[in-house]
Amino acid sequence: PARYTDQLKSAGLTVFHVVPSLSAALKAVECGVDGLIVEGGEGGGFKNPQDVASMVLLPLVRSKVDVPIIAAGGFLDGGTMAAAFALGAEAVQMGTRMVSAAESPVHANWKNAIVNAAETDTVFLNRAHSPALRAIRTEKTSRLEFSTDNVMGEFGTATDLYFGGDMEASIALTGQVAGRIDAVRPVAEVIAEVRKEFFEVVDTLARQYLSLIHI
């Protein structure tokens, strides 16, 4: 972040930096970012080879920094949003959920692979290198899962997968929440449901535990 933060802020942009560890978070804050996207190892995409789950990483970072935090990695509904807020986040990022949305420009084959995935149907790749990756399980990614070779060259044909629908052409970056997504739905419907679930969860928790305050 040291290279670009000042330039971006001078151009009037708000800068949130994605961080996979406490050390990265502290470095980003020192560089003057406006906020952090704290992403646990559950998330899809480019990862820290030494991945840390959101339930550990998010409250750890929150305890050490004062900037706004967007939680990423494992968040897709009102319940997980409420959990993120309880752990110190101000917002959530739902990457895999939005990749699977009706308006997403990626090929239907990728969306359907997310919908049909179990919670164990992602693989962690490239751990011996940097960045590591979390992707949906296919024949290709299953072969690459324990490879010590750098797999970044596989993205040379990414458009054949992303927009052409050939799931074996490249690597489909996908988070573990794929196992909880059961349909391709419009974004507006997803957001409305997340909001409704969030307030239901908060209301239920308040009613269940408010009385304990006076014990």
What spans do the regions from the language model cover?
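Conserved active-site-proximal phosphate/metal-binding subdomains
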Residues: 48-70, 76-212
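Alpha/beta enzyme core
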Residues: 1-67, 78-79, 83-87
